[in-house]
Swiss-Prot record:
GO function terms (MF aspect): glutamate-1-semialdehyde 2,1-aminomutase activity; pyridoxal phosphate binding; transaminase activity
Entry's family note: Belongs to the class-III pyridoxal-phosphate-dependent aminotransferase family. HemL subfamily.
Oligomer status and interactors: Homodimer.
Reactions listed under catalytic activity: (S)-4-amino-5-oxopentanoate = 5-aminolevulinate
Keywords: Cytoplasm, Isomerase, Porphyrin biosynthesis, Pyridoxal phosphate
Keyword check for Isomerase: yes
Species this chain originates from: Shewanella piezotolerans (strain WP3 / JCM 13877)
Name under which the protein is recorded: Glutamate-1-semialdehyde 2,1-aminomutase
Database matches in CDD domains: OAT_like (cd00610)
Localization annotation: Cytoplasm
């Protein structure tokens, strides 16, 4: 039994399932999770001392790589002044100004402590601003674990949402409508049925919780037009894509302007953080300037702001995103080439610094339905093969992979060499 195995058994006695977030339990791939002791650059090290090339990056925040010296220095400097004040600081003003500078659609921004808190607050604000109750989300997209968002589609195309978790009253879920990602007709049908009741559309501009599904041409623009037609707000959830897909997020990459944006992950530099912002007239509707209430004890925490600012400033350097995109393309296309060489069908998607691969005969994967039909047996086999080779991928076929600027040629080549060996074994059966 490894030290990670021992820690997992120990953890299950005091922590539900032994983890503090379900995907970490390895239920999607089987086996025991690796307990991580430290990380540096493109690498993580488990409790047994084994070293892995990391393509999870704490689920996206570590875009510069782990334990980056500039972020570490900023945090250590901030800690000298105290950990939390529960009062305004210059740091949070500077962070707000930096976010607004990088994302033109955000005229004002409110800091919170998590992505879930950001999306929950943005939806409350949209409902309050429009005086409408219903929201529209997409099947397969994840926006945190707020009650109104853990909802799946009903049995019919135009049915009201059904709770996807116990503990969510149906009275809450009935206000959440679920459409099909990359299908404008499904959105139009819901707006035609509820023309004056939908407060907002919330979506991942690149769906990173059904692996990695970019928007098809015209999809985001079509959603913008529908929102304008019916007076609903468009909320782009950039908790994952913000400052990972491009310097101005996915909205900048695809050229679409939302009314509200949610952020997290990258803006914290590895510390717990979230934010939501957008049009000034909408943001002025939140307390204390407006009637919609939102608050947070640790919102704008100075340590998180310091870490985030250090990371954001580094991301503003010339050539950063071109470099990141080139690395991501190289690794994704390398996976596909290695798989195809050994007769294993694979489709790939990639945008900016995130990628996904799918064990399927389909040439292109653009929908949640396609993702659910991928080979459910090949992914765990490939995952554990790569883990044994010292490559740490997301332990779920429904999660995107992430590159960092710390991934150099040596790491990329070692990863593809490992994939080549694993695919060769898979082909032999």
């Amino acid at each position: 039994m490894t030290r990670s195995d021992e820690l997992f058994e120990q953890a299950k006695k005091t922590i539900p399932g032994g983890v503090n977030s379900p995907v970490r339990a390895f239920n999607g791939v089987g086996g025991s999770p690796r307990f991580i002791e430290k990380a540096d650059g493109a690498y993580i090290f488990d409790a047994d001392g084994k070293k892995y090339i990391d393509y999870v990056g704490s689920w996206g925040p570590m875009i510069l790589g782990h334990n980056h010296p500039k972020i570490r220095a900023a945090v250590l400097e901030a800690v000298e002044n105290g950990l939390s004040f529960g009062a305004p600081t210059e740091l949070e003003v500077t962070m707000a100004e930096k976010v607004i500078e990088m994302v033109p659609s955000m005229e004002q921004v409110r800091m919170v402590s998590s992505g879930t808190e950001a999306t929950m607050s943005a939806i409350r604000l949209a409902r309050g601003f429009t005086s409408r109750d219903k929201i529209l989300k997409f099947e397969g997209c994840y926006h945190g674990h707020a009650d109104c968002l853990l909802v799946k589609a009903g049995s019919g195309a135009l049915t009201l949402g059904q709770p996807s978790s116990p503990g969510i009253p149906e009275d809450f879920a009935k206000h959440t409508l679920t459409a099909t990602y990359n299908d404008l007709d499904s959105v139009k049908a819901l707006f035609e049925q509820y023309p004056d009741a939908i407060s907002c559309i919330i979506l991942e501009p690149v769906a990173g919780n059904m692996n990695c599904i970019p928007p098809v041409e015209g999809f985001l623009e079509g959603l913008r037009a529908i929102c304008d037609q019916y007076g609903a707000l468009m909320i782009i959830d950039e908790v994952m894509t913000g400052f990972r897909v491009s310097k101005s997020g996915a909205q900048g990459h695809y050229g679409v302007t939302p009314d509200l944006t949610t952020l997290g992950k990258v803006i914290g530099g590895g510390m717990p953080v979230g934010a939501f912002g957008g049009r000034k007239d909408v943001m002025q509707f939140i307390a204390p300037t407006g009637p919609v209430y939102q608050a947070g004890t640790l919102s704008g925490n100075p340590i998180a702001m310091s870490a985030g600012l250090a990371q954001m400033e580094a991301l503003c350097e010339d050539g950063v995103y071109e470099q990141l995109a080139a690395k991501t393309q190289y690794i994704a296309e390398g996976f596909k080439a290695a798989a195809n060489k050994h007769g294993i069908p694979m489709a790939i998607n990639y945008v900016g610094g995130m990628f996904g691969f799918f064990f399927t005969d389909e040439e292109k994967v653009t929908s949640f339905e396609q993702v659910t039909k991928c080979d459910a047996e090949k992914f765990p086999e490939f995952y554990h093969g790569m883990l044994d080779e010292g490559v740490y991928l997301a332990p779920s076929a429904y999660e995107a992979g992430f590159l960092s600027l710390a991934h150099g040629e040596a790491e990329l080549e070692a990863t593809l060499a490992a994939a080549e060996r694993v695919f060769a074994k898979m082909a032999k059966g």
